[in-house]
Amino acid sequence: MDPNTVSSFQVDCFLWHVRKQVADQELGDAPFLDRLRRDQKSLRGRGSTLGLNIETATRVGKQIVERILKEESDEALKMTMASAPASRYLTDMTIEEMSRDWFMLMPKQKVAGPLCIRMDQAIMDKNIILKANFSVIFDRLETLILLRAFTEAGAIVGEISPLPSLPGHTNEDVKNAIGVLIGGLEWNDNTVRVSKTLQRFAWRSSDENGRPPLTPK
């Protein structure tokens, strides 16, 4: 096993622990809490894949971080922060919309790279809107937190989410997954639109297959 993979997991476990303490003291905003929940699932998946205990990894991660901070000068820290590009967190969905359980009458699931696509094939002749919460950097989607498809009545009929066991995905991964979800929903004569935010940063009116641009809602 690559030692860098192990140390990265250990540090991620400790940093998640620190962020959890922040949340427990009610110092985190909605995007912060959102990422915290998603990252917890991701760490569990990575731990299972690597065969590593999260509690033990957290303790080792703490030692790694403490050693780095001990060697890090304040001036070097300032320079690192100044040179790091800042990402933005964009939200189409509320916390309630993201955390709501949903059920499928005719479930269909497909894995596309590091993303899982789920949809209800029983949905027909509906107007559907795609909404997503994600981070953006350099005017492009950086990390998808969750994408869901909603009917006009607010029912959830589809979803794209990162696989906890396969962390990391690209803008193209997300774009391809959106295409699969839209294609599946349109197969049953549903009309699918995307949010303006998603249209701008992730979908960008794809026309590789001769499709007309989707109209933002």
Swiss-Prot record:
<dbReference type="GO" id="GO:0042025">
    <property type="term" value="C:host cell nucleus"/>
</dbReference>
<protein>
    <recommendedName>
        <fullName>Non-structural protein 1</fullName>
    </recommendedName>
</protein>
<keyword id="KW-1114">Inhibition of host interferon signaling pathway by virus</keyword>
<dbReference type="GO" id="GO:0030430">
    <property type="term" value="C:host cell cytoplasm"/>
</dbReference>
<dbReference type="Pfam" id="PF00600">
    <property type="entry name" value="Flu_NS1"/>
</dbReference>
<feature type="short sequence motif" description="Nuclear export signal">
    <location>
        <begin position="137"/>
        <end position="146"/>
    </location>
</feature>
<dbReference type="GO" id="GO:0003723">
    <property type="term" value="F:RNA binding"/>
</dbReference>
<feature type="short sequence motif" description="Nuclear localization signal">
    <location>
        <begin position="34"/>
        <end position="38"/>
    </location>
</feature>
<dbReference type="InterPro" id="IPR038064">
    <property type="entry name" value="NS1A_effect_dom-like_sf"/>
</dbReference>
<keyword id="KW-1103">Inhibition of host pre-mRNA processing by virus</keyword>
<dbReference type="GO" id="GO:0039502">
    <property type="term" value="P:symbiont-mediated suppression of host type I interferon-mediated signaling pathway"/>
</dbReference>
<keyword id="KW-0694">RNA-binding</keyword>
<dbReference type="GO" id="GO:0039580">
    <property type="term" value="P:symbiont-mediated suppression of host PKR/eIFalpha signaling"/>
</dbReference>
<keyword id="KW-1190">Host gene expression shutoff by virus</keyword>
<dbReference type="GO" id="GO:0039540">
    <property type="term" value="P:symbiont-mediated suppression of host cytoplasmic pattern recognition receptor signaling pathway via inhibition of RIG-I activity"/>
</dbReference>
<comment type="subunit">
    <text>Homodimer. Interacts with host TRIM25 (via coiled coil); this interaction specifically inhibits TRIM25 multimerization and TRIM25-mediated RIGI CARD ubiquitination. Interacts with human EIF2AK2/PKR, CPSF4, IVNS1ABP and PABPN1.</text>
</comment>
<keyword id="KW-0922">Interferon antiviral system evasion</keyword>
<keyword id="KW-1192">Host mRNA suppression by virus</keyword>
<keyword id="KW-1035">Host cytoplasm</keyword>
<keyword id="KW-1262">Eukaryotic host gene expression shutoff by virus</keyword>
<dbReference type="GO" id="GO:0039524">
    <property type="term" value="P:symbiont-mediated suppression of host mRNA processing"/>
</dbReference>
<keyword id="KW-1048">Host nucleus</keyword>
<dbReference type="GO" id="GO:0039657">
    <property type="term" value="P:symbiont-mediated suppression of host gene expression"/>
</dbReference>
<keyword id="KW-0832">Ubl conjugation</keyword>
<keyword id="KW-1090">Inhibition of host innate immune response by virus</keyword>
<comment type="function">
    <text>Inhibits post-transcriptional processing of cellular pre-mRNA, by binding and inhibiting two cellular proteins that are required for the 3'-end processing of cellular pre-mRNAs: the 30 kDa cleavage and polyadenylation specificity factor/CPSF4 and the poly(A)-binding protein 2/PABPN1. In turn, unprocessed 3' end pre-mRNAs accumulate in the host nucleus and are no longer exported to the cytoplasm. Cellular protein synthesis is thereby shut off very early after virus infection.</text>
</comment>
<dbReference type="GO" id="GO:0030291">
    <property type="term" value="F:protein serine/threonine kinase inhibitor activity"/>
</dbReference>
<keyword id="KW-1088">Inhibition of host RIG-I by virus</keyword>
<dbReference type="InterPro" id="IPR000256">
    <property type="entry name" value="NS1A"/>
</dbReference>
<feature type="region of interest" description="CPSF4-binding">
    <location>
        <begin position="180"/>
        <end position="215"/>
    </location>
</feature>
<keyword id="KW-0945">Host-virus interaction</keyword>
<feature type="region of interest" description="RNA-binding and homodimerization">
    <location>
        <begin position="1"/>
        <end position="73"/>
    </location>
</feature>
<dbReference type="InterPro" id="IPR009068">
    <property type="entry name" value="uS15_NS1_RNA-bd_sf"/>
</dbReference>
<keyword id="KW-1102">Inhibition of host PKR by virus</keyword>
<keyword id="KW-0899">Viral immunoevasion</keyword>
<dbReference type="InterPro" id="IPR004208">
    <property type="entry name" value="NS1"/>
</dbReference>
<keyword id="KW-1113">Inhibition of host RLR pathway by virus</keyword>
<comment type="similarity">
    <text>Belongs to the influenza A viruses NS1 family.</text>
</comment>
